[in-house]
Amino acid sequence: MTSQHSTRPVSQYTAREPEPSIPISGPVRLGAHLNSRGVDVAVLASHATAVEVCFVDTSAYHTSERRFRLRRSNHGIWTGHVPGIRAGQAYGYRVHGRWDPAQGLRHNPAKLLLDPYAKAIVRAPELHPALFSHVVDADLKPGADLKPDQRDSVDVTALGVVVEDQCTEINRPNTSWDQTVIYEAHVVGLTKNLPGIPPELRGTYAGAAHPVTINHLKTLGVTAIEFLPIHAKMTEPFLTAQGKENYWGYNTLNFFTPEPSYAMAASQNAGPQAILDEVKGMVKLLHEAGIEVLLDVVYNHTCEAGSDGPTLSWRGLDNSMYYRHDAQHPGRLIDTTGCGNSLDFRRLPVIQLTLDSLRYWVENIGVDGFRFDLAVTLGREGDSFNHMHPLYVAMATDPVLSQVKLINEPWDLGHGGWRTGQFPAPTADWNDRFRDTLRSFWVTEPAAIIHGGQGGDQRDLATRIAGSADLFGHGRIPGGRGVYSSINFITAHDGFTMHDLVAYNYKHNEANGENNRDGTENNRSWNHGVEGPTANARILSARRQTMRNLFASLIFSVGTPMITAGDEMMKTQDGNNNAYSQNGEVSWIDWDLDEDQRNMLETVSYLLRLRRDHRTFRPTNFYTGGHIDGDTIPDLTWLDHDGQTMPDYKWFDPHVRLLQALRSGFGQDADALVVVNGHPDSRVIALPQGRGTPFHLEWCSSWKTPRYTTTTYTPGAITRVPPLSFTLFFANPR
């Protein structure tokens, strides 16, 4: 298939003598920084023989360019001052040097390069042969000899824009970790279909902070919104060839610039500063509503792909410094990300770039934290992972970054890439063990039992409910990294939605154009009897109860819960578990809710209110099983169906799938009793003695909506819990 890329004519590169720049008189700061006389520029290109900063003016009919020679400074940095430059000026770099791809050197002055420190961009890259530093064929494939391409990329590449350095007054919610509930969302998909928002704001930064959006977030009870990447991005050529785009945005073009296409059309038309203002305005309005803003960030790789990919920025500036290469074959990239390249975090400039970018988003934009995609790559020193990597030491000791929320996706695709629980404080980790355990207990094991098979025992379930101390309770600090270092989740952007987890046995990714080969096969899902949509009332009821079991387990487990946007309303992606290229109805939240969806939303909101209002669900430390500060009951007691302390042998018995967990409110809050019945039939239980005060039935997952009952039971009372259910009781202190 021939790639659907631009073939419009572009000019050949013409070398000419650049104008001289003036030496910088003040401190050197990477990027472009305005002052009263003009602009200071500094860029890293350690293997270059010459570097030019190029100021570009474009119109529909003509592109003009002024080139200025920079001076080599210390540590491979090139600097210069150019008078008369003002905010709004487009610019890039041309880098001269050795062309030797076999040695990892890809200098080609025909390619105008985006400043890695640009704070704004104008024009998205246009997929065109001129974007490649090497000669490519009609399908954008390289020739065997990797000759340098002499076409000028100025008309098809992204340009940086000089902007004013602005101070931003930021009033943060500063939500404590124990109160934090994270809501993972895409800027576009969150509001593209949301009624009550003006059409021009839907699917934009402004729409994400519209009062209608904020009302939903506040009513639901989340405290932080974690946006999928909003760094400027570029779609991969193979997606462009299919007429698709990288909707999720895990293909970064620049680490400082917000993605322009997520701004309102009016902001895009007004220019880069208006886009920046819209992003800052979004953060400010969310802060005013008490909602923190977290960003999913992708520092592990860039959009330049493998060695046959385009040359947009880093590759042309200093390919052998920015990217990991095979030491024996320097022309070969090492890829631990599955995206063609990996940034080399053994290099101080890569660490500095990452830290500078993070600080910029905190101090200038106002964000409250980050989730690091494929974070193991950020902690690699060669093939090994160092949990005290210099990047993490720097973040932990940085006066700015140590004060925001830092979350790891604790794996990558390289050797030894699974590292959940092994990152340092004060960071938190996505807890995939929690996800897998809860899915197994509530979804796949009941399916196996109903079909004559056998489930697992309860040990791992209890460990996850109690905060995963096996993963987060160790280390040099007493108490380990702490109970809120576990980011508990059932679903995320990649994988099935909560609805699809209980409606599909198999992924259905045909719409992605990869013959259903993409996306994981390890879904731990169960369709409850019919694949996909059904009118069978029994199956639909069972699916909804399983979802309520999962939500309750997520919300009341110790740790920090994360909910995927739309799950609270039973969002479906029609079985697509890898909708990264689906910028459409498959990915956007459908806000036209039926009664069952409204009921689920009410239930999730109610459960989150219970978590917020009861300190019992938000302990300070890991449980000990002992009496804390003279309390008359242990901080946590595991009980069997008779209300007696769980005997050891029952923990190992796969036929025992019923447990009670009594959590102390320490005499200040109500004690909470959770009864988990993992059997496909109802079971008789005896409630524990507790403090001797009555137990109030608060909620059961068999209920379609919260009931606000007055039902109470005396300690030791006999009752029956429904099949496959999660039941919650409260007992008030004396």
Q: Predicted regions: what is each one?
A:
Residues 1-183, 188, 205, 539-548, ...:
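Carbohydrate-interacting/catalytic domains
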Residues 45-47, 72-74, 84-86, 97, ...:
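Short, flexible loop/turn elements at secondary-structure junctions
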Residues 366, 381, 387-565, 569-570, ...:
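Conserved alpha/beta catalytic core and glycan-binding cleft of carbohydrate-active enzymes
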Residues 43, 93, 185, 227, ...:
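Conserved, mostly hydrophobic/aromatic
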Residues 186-367, 374-400, 405, 417, ...:
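Substrate-binding/active-site clefts of carbohydrate-active enzymes
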Residues 100-104, 191-193, 233-237, 301-304, ...:
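Short catalytic/ligand-binding loop motif for oxyanion handling, primarily in non-cytosolic enzymes
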Residues 42, 180-181, 223-226, 290-292, ...:
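Beta-sheet entry/capping signal
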Residues 340-343, 372-377, 528-540, 585-592:
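Glycine- and acidic
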